[in-house]
Each structure stands twice: as C-alpha cells, then as structure tokens.
Amino acid sequence: MFMQLLSEARSYLEYGSGGSTIVATRMGVPTLTVESDRFFARAVTKQIAPGSPHTMLVADIGMTREWGVPVFKTPTPSRLKRWRTYVDLPFDTMKNDGIFPDLVLVDGRFRRACALESARQAQVRGVSTTIFVDDYQGRSYDPIEEYLGKPEMAGVAAIFRIGPHTTTVPVSAVDAAIHDYG
C-alpha cells in the first residue's frame, strides 16, 4: 500500500529516513525528510543520486542512541523545545513554498506528535493529505485516533486521510503528545 501511495504522490514528507527515502528519490518524488540522527542522515544522503529532488533536515533533539532515540527522555523545558523542533521543522521549511505534501510517512521519533501536527498543518492550509504511520499496530496511539478517527490498516501500518471532514487538531494536543513522549 505504501508503494502505491508513494507512486501517486506529487510531494512527500517523511519523519525518519532510510529505505523509503532512497526509493522515493529514485521514483523522482520531491521528498523532504526529517531525521534525528545526523550520522544516519549522512549515510542515507550518500545513497541518493546528486540532483534528486530531496532535502534532508536534521533536527537537533539532544543526544541520541541507535535509531535516533533520545538518550534522555524526561521532559524538561529545554528538551521539549528541542523535541518540538523535530515536529515543526518540515513545516517551518516549507511555509513559503506554497507546497504541501500529499503523503506524509511517520516512521521516526515523536510519532503521535508528528501525525497530529501534519494533520493540523493540512487543516490550517485547507489541503488534503494522507498520513501513513508505520509500526502502528501494537502501540498506544489513542491520541491520534481521538482527532483523526479510526485508521485504515495496511499490515501493521495505519493510514489516515486528512481533509475537510477531519476534526481540527489543537496545538495543545500536539504539545501533549510531545510531552508524553518521555
């Protein structure tokens, strides 16, 4: 299902880089990636052909271990600010482009917050998008469903179709999801 959605995408945002990044750029889909591990981001970027329509954004969320997971998870004001940067970075980057991704892959850190903020940003801009949350099954994602409704499932992934019918996501819900990450 993901490959079908990606092949239909005109613009693609992903939280977390890896194989999907390489596939998207090889398909020629304009891709914006947010990564929390600068070393992994560098390794992925080396595998992307020069001139590919790709932008890699590395968010400084503090010290990380494997998979870009924060070493320290107790929410403090400074950590919450850094973690919020990861969630907001792609939208801060694209706000003047007039482009909004029609496909968002949430496969990195702060998944609840990233899904909710992606939906919120689409609502603010009055556009539709599809949010694909990988590894959804077996995890606690009730805050996402509270605002976005029950997802369509594709294996262990969840697909949320965001449009005019979607309940408006308040900033406070995104903030709570970031705070509850730890």
Which positions does each model-derived feature cover?
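Short, charged, surface-exposed secondary-structure boundary motifs
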Residues: 40-49, 65-69, 139-146, 160-165
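Glycine-centered flexibility motif
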Residues: 18, 66-73, 108, 149
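S-adenosyl-L-methionine
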Residues: 45-98
